[in-house]
């Protein structure tokens, strides 16, 4: 019987070494080592009997915990087993153990363990971006308290909120530009400036309206003369003034560029300018030319140049006038004969 009692605890231990009650077995083993010395060292003949009593007490306690765990899913011993399984050596120096409750059985640790895993998936990229380093996943749940996770959650939220402020100045720039363009005083100043430049270029309002179609602006065709007139007189609606301003500004820039190019190369435009523009001679210069024509109807080229210089006229203008005057005299003589 002594041999049977001595073998009985060893028959019970494989059942108690299941992963579900490994923490209870380790706790009872620690209690046995502290409270009871080894039977072979004590030399007690009832050592094996004490071992069997302790084994039966462990089995009853295990059954009680299993029945209690069905009603209450929270297991402090399982939590303690999870916490005690973490090695004491620091494997991640970047995250120090600052909370003492992280190494003990915290009452709410097992409840929030799944939540911590989800939060760490979102926080770990933030830590790597901010330069804190990403620790190992097996050590993080045991070393970070839920309160620490809340603080890092606020840090992640603050980092996420920092991006709109960085973009805010860029998004505010178009609003400032639109305010400047929609200012009535700016529109009035541009309308007056446009009118003065148009007159200086020698272009009519109708020419401006017809030339807008040549700009190839999407949605913009030729406009009537009355529309350009109403823009210069500020009688259009405010929205139409705002919409028409960039179109007229584009035309004005192109017209001034063409005008500057024509002035820089006048020899390319003399022929077309002579056909398009008609010269008018004032009355005093006309009387002087008639006096020269009465003296010499066919002056030489040198005489024409001298007359043009004296009257402050172009040589070509004086030459054409003498030619036209001779044709006029021929018509008068022909009509008088017939």
From Swiss-Prot:
Keywords linked to the UniProt accession: Activator, Cytoplasm, Differentiation, DNA-binding, Homeobox, Nucleus, Transcription, Transcription regulation
PROSITE patterns named among the record's database cross-references: HOMEOBOX_1, HOMEOBOX_2, POU_1, POU_2, POU_3
Biological process annotations from GO: axon extension; inner ear auditory receptor cell differentiation; inner ear development; inner ear morphogenesis; inner ear receptor cell differentiation; neuromuscular process controlling balance; neuron apoptotic process; positive regulation of transcription by RNA polymerase II
InterPro entries per record: HD, Homeobox_CS, Homeodomain-like_sf, Lambda_DNA-bd_dom_sf, POU, POU_dom, POU_domain_TF
GO cellular component terms attached to this protein's record: cytoplasm; nucleoplasm; nucleus; transcription regulator complex
Pfam family for this entry, one: Homeodomain
Effect of disrupting the coding gene: Mutants are deaf and show deficits in balance and coordination that become severe at about P14 and exhibit hyperactivity by 5-6 weeks.
Tissue: Brain.
Matches recorded under SUPFAM superfamilies: Homeodomain-like (SSF46689), lambda repressor-like DNA-binding domains (SSF47413)
GO function term, MF aspect, one: DNA-binding transcription activator activity, RNA polymerase II-specific
Location of the motif POU-IV box: 56-65
General function of this protein: Acts as a transcriptional activator. Acts by binding to sequences related to the consensus octamer motif 5'-ATGCAAAT-3' in the regulatory regions of its target genes. Involved in the auditory system development, required for terminal differentiation of hair cells in the inner ear.
Subunit structure: Interacts with ISL1.
Similarity section: Belongs to the POU transcription factor family. Class-4 subfamily.
Protein name: POU domain, class 4, transcription factor 3
């Amino acid at each position: 019987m002594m041999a049977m009692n001595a073998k009985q605890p060893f028959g019970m231990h494989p059942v108690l070494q299941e992963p579900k009650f490994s923490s209870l077995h380790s706790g009872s083993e620690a209690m046995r080592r502290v409270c009871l010395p080894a039977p072979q060292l004590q030399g007690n003949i009832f050592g094996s009997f004490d071992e069997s009593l302790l084994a039966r007490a462990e089995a009853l306690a295990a059954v009680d915990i299993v029945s209690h765990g069905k009603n209450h899913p929270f297991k402090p011993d399982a939590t303690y087993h999870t916490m005690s399984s973490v090695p004491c050596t620091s494997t991640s120096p970047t995250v120090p153990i600052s909370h003492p409750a992280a190494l003990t059985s915290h009452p709410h640790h097992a409840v929030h363990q799944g939540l911590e895993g989800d939060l760490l998936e979102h926080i770990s990229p933030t830590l790597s971006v901010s330069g804190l380093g990403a620790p190992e996943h097996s050590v993080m749940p045991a070393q970070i308290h839920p309160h620490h996770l809340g603080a890092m959650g606020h840090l992640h939220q603050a980092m996420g909120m920092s991006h709109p402020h960085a973009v805010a100045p860029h998004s505010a720039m178009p609003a400032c530009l639109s305010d400047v363009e929609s200012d009535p005083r700016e529109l009035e100043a541009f309308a007056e400036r446009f009118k003065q430049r148009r007159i200086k270029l020698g272009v009519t309002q109708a020419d401006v309206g017809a030339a807008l179609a040549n700009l190839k602006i999407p949605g913009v065709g030729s406009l009537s003369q009355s529309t350009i007139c109403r823009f210069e007189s500020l009688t259009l609606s405010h929205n139409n003034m705002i919409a028409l301003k960039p179109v007229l500004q584009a035309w004005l820039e192109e017209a001034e560029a063409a005008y500057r190019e024509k002035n820089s190369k006048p020899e390319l435009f003399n022929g077309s300018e002579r056909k398009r523009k008609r010269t008018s001679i004032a009355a005093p210069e006309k009387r002087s030319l008639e006096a020269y024509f009465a003296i010499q109807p066919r002056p030489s080229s040198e005489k024409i140049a001298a007359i043009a210089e004296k009257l402050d006229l172009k040589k070509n203008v004086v030459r054409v006038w003498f030619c036209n005057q001779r044709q006029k005299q021929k018509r008068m003589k022909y009509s008088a004969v017939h």
